[in-house]
Amino acid sequence: MTKRASQTGNSREKLHCSFCGKAQDEVRRLVAGPGVYICDECISLCNEIIAEEPQSGEKTAIVGDIPKPTEIKKILDQYVIGQEQAKKALAVAVYNHYKRIFHNERKAGDVELEKSNIMLIGPTGSGKTLLAQTLARILKVPFAIVDATALTEAGYVGEDVENIILKLIQNADNDVKRAEMGIIYIDEIDKISRKSDSASITRDVSGEGVQQALLKIIEGTVANVPPQGGRKHPHQEYIPVETKNILFICGGAFVGLTDIIKQRVGVKSIGFHSNEVVNDRGRKIEEGESLVHHVIPDDLMKFGLIPEFIGRLPIIATLDELTIESLKSIFTEPKNSLLKQYQKMFDIENVKLKFTESAIEAIAQTAIKRESGARGLRAIVEEIMMELMFQIPSRKDVLEVVVTDDTVLKKEAPITILKGDIEKIA
């Protein structure tokens, strides 16, 4: 017994940490693994190294290299046709937002720059979401889109406002530090306007209540985000997220807003039998010019947004309603235009795809009639191309497909040019 005990004791004395080489009696604890040992000191050192690693990568790709407003707009031009005023406003706002972050982090001077979130106002399909998505891609920051109509204030059926932060964390591969520098686009923000421009004693859980709930998050606070989403409850753990550096872009169509603006600017008579709409500064609003470009915070208050909420979104960028010409350009010109995407899909099958000018005109006219904007273009083209895309992969005799206006307007089949036809001509 004694001999075995002493042998065991001797064997224990020979145990050493596989990493630092210290003996068992030189450290407080030695943890054994399959053929290896690690002491408590090495474990502590490993924890410190792991804790330091996220800090080295917590800055986004834009640190020290924020694209200038002119550079941002130039890239936006590749993806979004028209909307010059909105692109310039967004380029300046985004540049100033990230410049502010780095200024405040360096604590340069006594002046702390305040956060400026953005309100995008424009018709359905005018490019609001695409602008926000493209900005996030330019800046290489996490991006999340949420629908304001799904949100309700705490205590009611629906999503808590903190869940919008969770989507950003998920899109940042669960890297909270990266998410804290991201962009959140809240769509259909006009749908959470209160039902009248006067305060009500009745509960408006999807309107004014949601605006109140969003205030702190948009302004900047430490939000406690439930890791699994859904409603909060007292016994779950939360992810603390600092929102002061998250850029919030809120977008909406604001149907009826132009009527409010028109009531404010009024119609003034100039000379005999002539009426001209002028803005508050007396400048004539030209025929065809959208009244939405003359929106002021008071108009949004009358629409149903509360003053505190409007104050958190000081930058207002407005988008024009799309015309037939702009829809034609959107279909053909951008870097990843719908035309180029479909041509690429057919090219993979070794088939050329062509749309005649009259076909493109007809597609744009159809989108205008449906009031679906740019996003309606894909649905129209899908209807036209569905049967062809079903057949083409199985056919090896098709050389080229030509879509005409009759294909769009009369639902006739596109013209197909077969390889045999070319051989006969030759």
UniProtKB/Swiss-Prot annotation:
GO molecular function terms listed in the Swiss-Prot or TrEMBL record: ATP binding; ATP hydrolysis activity; ATP-dependent protein folding chaperone; protein dimerization activity; unfolded protein binding; zinc ion binding
Family matches, as Pfam families: AAA_2, ClpB_D2-small, zf-C4_ClpX
GO cellular component: HslUV protease complex
PROSITE patterns linked to this entry: CLPX_ZB (PS51902)
Coiled-coil portions: none
SMART domains: AAA, ClpB_D2-small, zf-C4_ClpX
Binding site for Zn(2+): 17, 20, 39, 42
Signal peptide (UniProt feature, chain positions): none
GO term, biological process aspect, one: proteolysis involved in protein catabolic process
Keywords: ATP-binding, Chaperone, Metal-binding, Nucleotide-binding, Zinc
Gene3D superfamilies membership: 1.10.8.60, ClpX chaperone, C4-type zinc finger domain, P-loop containing nucleotide triphosphate hydrolases
Binding site residues for ATP: 123-130
Residues annotated as domain ClpX-type ZB: 5-58
Protein origin, superkingdom: Bacteria
Family statement drawn from the similarity comment of this UniProt entry: Belongs to the ClpX chaperone family.
Stated role: ATP-dependent specificity component of the Clp protease. It directs the protease to specific substrates. Can perform chaperone functions in the absence of ClpP.
The protein's assembly and partners: Component of the ClpX-ClpP complex. Forms a hexameric ring that, in the presence of ATP, binds to fourteen ClpP subunits assembled into a disk-like structure with a central cavity, resembling the structure of eukaryotic proteasomes.
Protein name: ATP-dependent Clp protease ATP-binding subunit ClpX
Species this chain originates from: Leptospira biflexa serovar Patoc (strain Patoc 1 / ATCC 23582 / Paris)
Lineage of the organism: Bacteria, Pseudomonadati, Spirochaetota, Spirochaetia, Leptospirales
